[in-house]
Amino acid sequence: MAAAALWQPQEEGLREICTLLDAHISPNSDQARIWQQLQHYSQFPDFNNYLVFLLARGEGKSFEARQAAGLLLKNNLRATFSSMPPASQQYVKSELLPCIGATNKAIRSTVGTVISVLFQIVRVAGWIELFQALHQCLDSNDLDHMEGAMDAIYKICEDVPEELDVDVPGLPERPINVFMPRLLQFFQSTHAILRKLALGCINQYIVVMPAALYMSMDQYLQGLFNLAKDPSADVRKLVCSAWVQLIEVRPSILEPHLKNVTELMLQANKDSDDEVALEACEFWSAYCDVSMPPEGLREFLPRLIPTLLSNMSYSDDDESLADAEEEESFPDRDQDLKPRFHASRLHGSETGEDDDDDDAVNVWNLRKCSAAGLDVLSNVFGDDILPTLMPLIQQNLARTDDDAWKEREAAVLSIGAIAEGCITGLYPHLPQIVAFLIPLLDDKFPLIRSITCWTLSRYSKFIVQSLEHPNGREQFDKILLGLLRRVLDTNKRVQEAACSAFATLEEEAAEELVPHLGIILQHLMCAYGKYQRRNLRILYDALGTLADAVGAELNQAKYLDIFMPPLITKWQQLANSDKDLFPLLECFTSIAQALGPGFSQFAEPVFQRCINLIQSQHLAKVDPAAAGALYDKEFIVCALDLLSGLAEGLGAGIESLVSQSSLRDILLQCCMDEAADVRQSALALLGDLSRVCPIHLHPRLQEFLNVAAKQLNPQCVKEAVSVANNACWAIGELAIKIGKEISPVVITVVSCLVPILKSPEGLNKSLLENSAITLGRLCWVCPDIVAPHMDHFMQAWCNALCMIRDDFEKEDAFHGLCAMVAANPTGAVGSLTFICQACASWNEIKSEGLHNEVCQILNGYKQMLGSGGWEQCMSTLEPAVVQRLGRYGV
């Protein structure tokens, strides 16, 4: 301590740093230059001493400059504390403690933040004095000191709650055991800020549940009940948050109190403060998600449903209302462009999720939470909610005056929210619902037009299912044309909702769209000419979805002439560094796959652009100035995925493009990229090229195989399962094309696939299926290498084969199974029941050759075992399995 106390700042250094901090907080300063100067000062070993001195003792300096010193100190400590001289470390710690109760709130708060960051580095044992100081502040009865201590404790609880629940040499008890009674006492404080901070601290422990909280649970719950009507909205919000967390992670604790808690949450859901109501509203979804007995909620439905419906109306200050009137002539601002995320290509089971968002602006609010709650309730209680809900909806819809448009809009939203859960009761009335919604597409209020688009999209699946019903086609046509009409709306919010809804309808309708292709394309391309950047992204998605839905039907000159010229014009206009290329690349990927060989007339410039994009990004990675752009891996991912789409669409027709390019070397580089999503897309392309032109991979074949095999080691699988999935698939594709040339990596790959096949739940279904298929392909082409090891994997492999649907990939895997048995029939006999189950998993083997092979194997075993042994084997199988095996003549 003595050495630390000797440190004193030099006046000149202090003055320079103060001047710099004053400039730093000035709005008109050159921040880049100031940042450089701060970096220069940070090289000095005692720079942090100056910062903590200014924060703690900067009397006469502006509070803003002292705060800036504290925030700079916080960031520096994160990066440099462990390398600071011990005397400086001690000085920083000792200067912070007296400031916990600083009279200025901003300084107190900054000190609490710095303490929390420093605590994360040194932990309890490295700063025992902190806890002594916090106790003294809590016991001081001075509000500034109590609040400062509570603020610091709250920030520690928020960042590392588990660190207070540890035994520490030198302390008689765990810190949380000492703090917990004090925190619970503060529930009764006359100061709202102390009640809020105490409750906030304890709430951080609901998930980790230390003994200190578990043993005080009755007192904590009683405190929550007492604070439910607290005058402070912040406190009431935290009470609701506590109930939501408890029901999510400790529902058994709430069960005895559930009725009382539900009543309180129902009241809180009507709170005059929207944030309290929003927190309370989360309770209903949480209740249903943890599978609490629904009967406990049923008696509240007659009061809960009207509350949810009431809260689904736009509030007057909802920020969505601000841009609701924005016409297409308004230029998009950069902040209007939501960040977009491209999903890298994945081979295997599809895991895409619907985005049922009813609002263009993704801000979670009471309206959306209420709609989500109604959706969840409809899925739990089904049609039972309709007698309460439908009269309320009808009542709101009957209010046709302009002042009631928000209530009408909420009614339409609620019809959409219950589309899945209440469909049994609603399905007979679908024609009336649709007939009612169609005119609302032309409502004078744009937000009613937009929500009607969304609600119709929620019923798309059922509308398509009704096509063969009387008037079903007429109903479908009206919806299709109605949505297309709104795609051309002049309001940007309506355009967005209509385009998204139309994409959903496309997914459900698929080939039913074919008779309407001309009119669909005319509308979409008319919109293409008038949309601004944000809605263009959604339009690209609608075009890509259309291509996925109708496939080769799009490959007709009359259609190509409508949509390809505008797309190509845009493609040529956009620079290689323009992020508006992303959705266009994705759109072209779907179009290339749909058109197949029909895309060949457009392929060469598209292929070359993809190569250029990847090369320019590789350059940007090492030399942004030479590339003229900053590195952005998403360009590489999108370009690789479009090349995959070309390979899939053109098939062997891509060979001439690949042979004249440097794609092979570029692809190998991408397969080794440090970014998982780049490797994922690169390995997908490797698999696609293996299918259509493996000859061009040959010069670097072993390198590709080694890189792909490396992605299957257990650590890589754990870190990036989707990369492993694509690597596995690519190796399987290569195996059937190159045969014995794959032998150098066979044992490495098999040794990685076996743990995947044997793993209990938790591994991705797609990886499991691809592992079973690739193992089968390796067994097929190199049976002599794999057969000696079959007892390690046969049973797990057969179990996985049972899960795979009938297709050519399953056929390949079964060729491998037959090759294994042929190579070592006695070695496989111990797994015979599993082999039988796998053979019985086929609905029908289309390949006559494979069917005969399976017959041969099973009959061979029947002869080997004799009738007694065979009957014994059959007796262990389900009767349905034995019956299916009859198809193979056994």
UniProtKB/Swiss-Prot annotation:
Q: Which GO terms describe its biological process?
A: protein import into nucleus
Q: Which GO terms describe its cellular component?
A: cytoplasm; nucleoplasm
Where is it localised? Cytoplasm; Nucleus, Nucleoplasm
Against InterPro entries, the record matches this protein to: ARM-like (IPR011989), ARM-type_fold (IPR016024), HEAT (IPR000357), Importin-beta_N (IPR001494), Importin_beta (IPR040122)
PROSITE patterns from the entry?
IMPORTIN_B_NT
Coiled coil region boundaries: none
Q: Which UniProt keywords apply?
A: Cytoplasm, Nucleus, Protein transport, Repeat, Transport
* SUPFAM superfamilies with a match to the protein in the record: ARM repeat (SSF48371)
Q: Where are the HEAT repeats?
A: 13-39, 44-82, 91-124, 130-167, 177-207, 220-247, 259-286, 302-380, 388-419, 431-458, 476-509, 517-550, 558-596, 604-652, 663-694, 702-739, 747-783, 791-824, 833-865
Q: Where is the Importin N-terminal domain?
A: 34-102
Ranges of compositional bias, category Acidic residues = 316-329
Q: Name one GO molecular function term.
A: small GTPase binding
Q: Name the Pfam families for this protein.
A: HEAT, HEAT_EZ, IBN_N
In this chain, the stretch annotated as Disordered covers: 316-336
- Show the PANTHER family listed in the entry: IMPORTIN BETA
- Function per UniProt: Functions in nuclear protein import as nuclear transport receptor. Serves as receptor for nuclear localization signals (NLS) in cargo substrates. Is thought to mediate docking of the importin/substrate complex to the nuclear pore complex (NPC) through binding to nucleoporin and the complex is subsequently translocated through the pore by an energy requiring, Ran-dependent mechanism. At the nucleoplasmic side of the NPC, Ran binds to the importin, the importin/substrate complex dissociates and importin is re-exported from the nucleus to the cytoplasm where GTP hydrolysis releases Ran.
Q: Which family does it belong to?
A: Belongs to the importin beta family. Importin beta-2 subfamily.
The protein's name: Transportin-1
Organism whose genome encodes this protein? Oryza sativa subsp. indica (Rice)
